[in-house]
Amino acid sequence: MCKLRVLFIVCLAAWAFVDSFATKKGRVGIEIGYLDSLPAEIDGGLCTFYKSLDDVEKDRYVLTNDSAENAYVMVNGKLEKLSLVANNDENYLYVNKDYKLTVKISGTRFSAKRDYNYIVAFLIIENRNHDKRKIKCYGFCGC
């Protein structure tokens, strides 16, 4: 009886280990990709955010929004639309059923010559599994 109990405990521990490994390996995480065009819903004022200043020249942006009401970001190869739920001068919080996106503004300059704002920000996106990705971005907002 004792041997059977030990065998059962060993099998249970082995199953838990294998299940835990498979769950961790199965997690996708968060990869932020580039948008290849503006979503059709955007009409009027917008902001676009880039991973690097080189991406600005190539017009390769990772986030765009329509006057801060909705944000669009490519996550794991899928275009996600998130809605604004809270904001102040430096933070914007967007959510949808799968993700929470925080845009933290760390610096802003206005260019009267070109009629837009230049922004330095951090994008923090989190999924329901609490996986997070944080990237520094450079943005331009205007009409």
Q: Where are the model-predicted features located?
A:
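A mature extracytoplasmic/lumenal domain signature
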Residues: 77, 86, 105-109, 139-141
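Short, low-complexity, Pro/Ser/Thr/Gly-rich segments in the mature regions of secreted, periplasmic
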Residues: 133-143
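Exposed beta-strand and adjacent loop surfaces of beta-rich binding modules
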Residues: 68-70, 100, 120, 132-134
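Bacterial Sec-dependent N-terminal signal peptides
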Residues: 1-24
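An ectodomain-focused feature that recognizes extracytoplasmic/extracellular
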Residues: 23-85
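Short, solvent-exposed loop/turn motifs
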Residues: 46, 79, 100, 131-132
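Acidic, glycine-rich flexible loop segments
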Residues: 88-128
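Short capping micro-motif at the N-terminus of alpha-helices
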Residues: 82-83, 103, 135
